Amino acid sequence: MPLPYIYSLQHCPYAMRARLGLLMAQQKVMVRAITLNNKPAEMLALSKKGTVPILVITNEEGAGLTIIDESLDIMLWALKISDPHNLLHKDTPTELDDMLALIKKNDDEFISVLEKYKHASRYYDFSQLYYRRQCEGFIAQLEETLQENDYFFGATASLADYALLPFVRQFARVDRKWYLQTPYPKLRDWLKRHLQQGVFTKAMAKFPMWTDNHEDYLLGSSIKG
């Protein structure tokens, strides 16, 4: 049976989230790298959403395809099959609901103001400073969560840590000089630890465009050239 494959964009935070989940679950998945201005017809035919990530799984005995086109669902699919780092904290199953609640707050509330903070020049109602302060409500909550532990749900990383990582990284990159002197030292340490991990380097590997050669590449491998 062929390996699953994922349509992915290198710097898309949702695709990044999905790739991190797949790598942490040690799932063998092939990557089809795309660009937003040249979406392959094959991808668009699979999901009405028309954006990455899209994971395609061949069902047993070739009985059709399973399509997963939400980044968190891709993480959960992979980790429910294999969770070698215990990101779901199976010993305390009630924590999963808390993780999902934190991720939902990130996705439903933080990301929308983060986008405005990143692209403040497109929004004429308020300044970048205004949107940054809107972001800081959630950022301060994360800082408070990290006061007693290195990760959001204890001494070890969880699903929530990896699901939020791409978006906290984006926040930190908007105005790095300001970010480095903010009163969020625990969150800075948290982000630094994640960015220094080998899995993050693998998740950010650049692959040739699938539309150029129609070749798939194994997630986690490196392409030289």
Region locations from a protein language model:
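Short, hydrophobic secondary-structure boundary micro-motifs
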Residues: 86-91, 114, 152-155, 201-205
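Charged/polar, low-hydrophobicity segments characteristic of intrinsically disordered regions
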Residues: 116-118, 193-212
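Residue-level recognition of oxygen-bearing side chains
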Residues: 73, 186, 199
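Phosphate/oxyanion-binding loops and surfaces in catalytic or ligand/nucleic-acid-binding neighborhoods
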Residues: 81-85, 174, 197
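Residues that scaffold the ATP/ADP-binding catalytic core of kinase and kinase-like folds
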Residues: 77, 174, 203
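Acidic/histidine-enriched, glycine/proline-rich intrinsically disordered or flexible terminal extensions
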Residues: 207-225
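GST-like domain detector, emphasizing the conserved glutathione-binding G-site
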Residues: 1-133
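GST-like fold's C-terminal all-alpha helical module
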Residues: 98, 102-196
